[in-house]
């Protein structure tokens, strides 16, 4: 319906909730955001990709509570931002093995998301920020950079018609939402990214572990996500509530 709510859910681990909890007030205060869009932080500390594989995991109850607190039902969750990683990825081998394990876990998590939120139509995929300052094996380079390939493979597999990622009821049982690229958050430390000059300084990551974002790192991601949702051709019409001229015909 034209006045129905659009639940926008985050899916991911500690970094994701830390960034999304800064994105939410930023988005809610932005005049460009449609009042129909309700931002809900489903991401949770310690809940890396493998934890979303179990449909009975405690994390789902937490999402349910947060969703209800935001005044939403499961059927109103229509869009998600999935930013995931593998905890201690070295255990899964070198590239591409660890990225394949990561991809398989996300596929199973997506099936659970679609089952629990039947009107979840789009999931925007992001891999994590630079991890070259990491002091622990939790989520270091080069694994973090390489995890973006799993996101690419997910999108490619869906385009290729893999049944476990089918989003089109005309082609069989729907197992997944539509997968689209979200904002790409990685940049090579202090080397400016060609597209937009993005860098990550040491102070953009926390002092203690160099793995989780500091307040400045969180702000960078929140800004990137908000800008993406306001400008991406697949997102801006529902996020701002303004149909493009093509869509309004």
Which residues does each PLM region occupy?
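Alpha/beta-hydrolase-fold catalytic nucleophile elbow
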Residues: 83, 125-126, 182
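Short, well-ordered beta-to-alpha junction loops that form the rim of enzyme active sites
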Residues: 13, 126-129
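Aromatic-lined carbohydrate-recognition surfaces of secreted/lumenal glycan-active proteins
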Residues: 118-127
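Conserved SGNH/GDSL esterase-like catalytic core that processes O-acyl groups on lipids
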Residues: 2-100
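Extended catalytic cores and adjacent scaffolds of nucleotide/polyanion-binding enzymes
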Residues: 95, 123, 137
